[in-house]
Structure formats: C-alpha cells, structure tokens
From Swiss-Prot:
Full protein name: Dihydroorotase
Species annotation: Saccharomyces cerevisiae (strain ATCC 204508 / S288c)
Induction trigger: By N-carbamoyl-L-aspartate.
E.C. no: 3.5.2.3
Gene from which this protein is expressed: URA4
Keyword Ribosomal protein among UniProt keywords: no
HAMAP family reported for this sequence: PyrC_classII
Length: 364
C-alpha cells in the first residue's frame, strides 16, 4: 500500500483569493493545501484590466505568501486592447485572460456576451501571438422566455460548447481552457478536440476539474448552500465522467480548484446565496482521496503537477520556491470553520469530514 508520493511542484490552475481581510486569510492557505503554483482569477471589484493593477495585486499576494508562485490574469472586457495584451505579456505580468459570460457567477457583471465573441477577436489574435491562455467560464446565461430553447443551470455548460469549438476553429493555435467542467458532454467535447493529441506539449484546448465537482451531484447542493457553486454540480453520470477524466492520465485534464471563499453569512442567505465552494486549505488531500478510491494514485502527479505546468509552460526559474510537495498517509479532520479570529469566517468543503492524506514540504 502506497504511504507517500513525491508530487514535485504542484499547481492549482484556478484560484480565487479575493481582496482585503479575506485575501489575507486565504492566500497563505494555498501552500497549506499542498499547492506550490496558483493561477489567480481577476474577478475583483472592479475587475483587473490594467497593467498597474495586476502587478500590484501580485505584489500583495507575494507578500502574503512568499513561497507560493502566482500566475496572474486579466479579465476579458472592452477595456482590454491588443497593445495592452502585448505589453503585459512582454513584461511577464499575465499568463492569460479570463472570460466570464455576463451575470453567470460571482463578480461577472462586467463580463461578455457569450453568443458573439467577434468583438474580442483582435484580443484573441494578440493572445495567440503571445502564447497566452484564454480561460473560459463555459456557461450561457439562463433564458426562460420567448421561443428560444430554455437555458438553465443544468444545461448552461452544454449550451456553451459550440462557442468553444468555434473559438478553437477560428484560433487553432490559441491555448484555451474550459474551466471547471461539470458535465459529461463537456468531457466528451474536450476529448473529441484532442483525439489526435499524443503528448502534453501538443495540447491546445484543455479542461480544468475541481475537487468539489468530483464529489458532488445536484442532491448535495439543492439543500446545502455551502456546496452551491457555478457551474453547479449536476447528475451522477456527469460526476462519473468527471472522475474518469481526472484519473485518466490524459494531459488535457488537470487540476483547477475554483476555490472560492465567501464569508459564512453570505452562504447562509435564504435568497441570493453566493456561488462558490472553499477548498483551498485541503486541495491536494481532497484530490488524493478520489484517486485512491479509483486505484489511480499513479496518475495523481500528472493531474496536480505535470499537465498544468506543461500547458502553462512554467519554468523552474519562475517559481518562488523549489520545495516539493510530499503527500503522505496521515488522517486529518477538516475543521467546521476557518476564521481569521476577527471578522471573517468561512466554511470549508466537507467540513467535519476525515481525509486520509496530508501534505508536507521538502527541499528539492
């Protein structure tokens, strides 16, 4: 029985750390959860769309967690220009641009219309030239009236997939990630796009998978706001497809937690519950539990390290710390609440449950 695994430089390619007191609480927890490299989301208020702001935000994060490597991103909006994309890339200020369809998730009001991306094609062209990554929140906004086919939380991701395929056809060398996949149809689409891929360096379109979507179905959030997120967890067949993809060892599926902290009072509303699951403090142990249950621990390093590093082309010279993550057998109990002892309290994913694995850090 495996008791210890050297995971090397682990990476979580979809992380929310917010601002202010919440940021101060959760940013150091990235390393606590066994993650070395974190790709940071730009959906602050207002969104990150300027060079000065993304540089300042990274400085703030680096001060809070000096041993964590932060990869930064812009928020896709009309404020971006091709010249800004080129400048930010050449200054190594960003690794990608995140696309939020307007209104589908937290702080997405400034997002774009996913029915027509043509206005942003000059941006995508500049990104392709700079080898930047386009990160897609792959959902269409809900539509419940008129003669149009209804779109709702259970089919919003599937409705978005034709837009993903069109973007790839129009920009075949642009690196694209369908973030936090939740559906069997999304997994099939990513596999179809990659049917001729032989190795990790060939991947142009990838998908991130979260920890919580490998555990949850619709029944788990319908009566529990702590498990409510966007995109929502779906049906048992969808979860089965996600788990199969995660443990497959295919280089176009890798880890992005979409860990999204909210103050406990914002998750306890009877109306307007904030979407987001907080998983950062135990990120790698959650994933290890799934891989162990699937008898696939030999593929864990690819999912939480190698494939993400390859897709984002992270070099050793860029990392803040070369320490390696060692996963080892040691039971731990997830606390009911994580707090700064002052004003901020958050409920972690699977609060009160036991995990079989822990993480420590060792020099490489």
């Amino acid at each position: 029985m495996v008791q210890e695994i050297d995971l090397g430089l682990t990476c979580d390619m979809h992380v929310h750390v917010r601002e202010g007191a919440m940021c101060e609480l959760v940013t150091p927890k990235i390393r606590d959860g066994g993650v070395s490299i974190a790709y940071i989301m730009p959906n602050l208020q207002p969104p990150i769309t300027t060079l000065d702001r993304v540089i300042e935000y990274k400085k703030t994060l680096q001060k809070l967690a000096p041993k964590t490597t932060f990869l930064m991103s812009f928020y896709l909006s009309k404020d971006l220009t091709p010249d800004l994309i080129h400048e930010a890339a050449q200054q190594h200020a960003i690794r990608g641009v995140k696309c939020y369809p307007a209104g589908v998730t937290t702080n997405s009001a400034a997002g774009v219309d996913p029915n027509d991306f043509s206005a942003f094609y000059p941006i995508f062209k500049a990104m392709q030239e700079e080898n930047l990554v386009l990160n897609l929140h792959g959902e269409k906004p809900s539509v419940h009236d008129g003669d149009k086919e209804p779109i709702h939380v259970l089919n919003a991701e599937e409705a978005f997939l034709p837009a993903l395929k069109k973007l790839h056809n129009d920009f075949p060398n642009l690196k694209i990630i369908l973030e936090h996949c939740t559906s069997e149809s999304a997994i099939k689409t990513i596999e179809d796009i990659n049917k001729n891929v032989k190795k990790a360096t060939d991947v142009k379109v990838a998908a991130t998978l979260t920890a919580h979507h490998l555990f949850l179905t619709i029944d788990d959030w319908a009566g529990n706001p702590v498990n409510f997120c966007k995109p929502v967890a779906k049906l048992p067949n969808d979860k089965k497809a996600l788990v199969k993809a995660a443990v497959s060892g295919k280089p176009y599926f890798f880890f992005g937690s979409d860990s999204a902290p909210h103050p406990v009072q914002n998750k306890a509303n009877y109306e307007g519950v904030c979407a987001g699951v907080y998983s950062q403090s135990f990120a790698i142990p959650y994933i290890a539990q799934v891989f162990e249950e699937q008898n696939a621990l030999e593929n864990l390093k690819g999912f939480v390290s190698d494939f993400g590093i390859s897709f984002y082309e992270v070099k050793d010279s860029e990392v803040a710390s070369s320490d390696k993550a060692i996963l080892f057998k040691k039971e731990q109990v997830i606390p009911q609440v994580i707090s700064d002892g002052k004003d901020i309290s958050i409920i972690p994913f699977k609060a009160g449950d036991k995990l079989s694995w822990s993480v420590r850090w060792e020099p490489r």
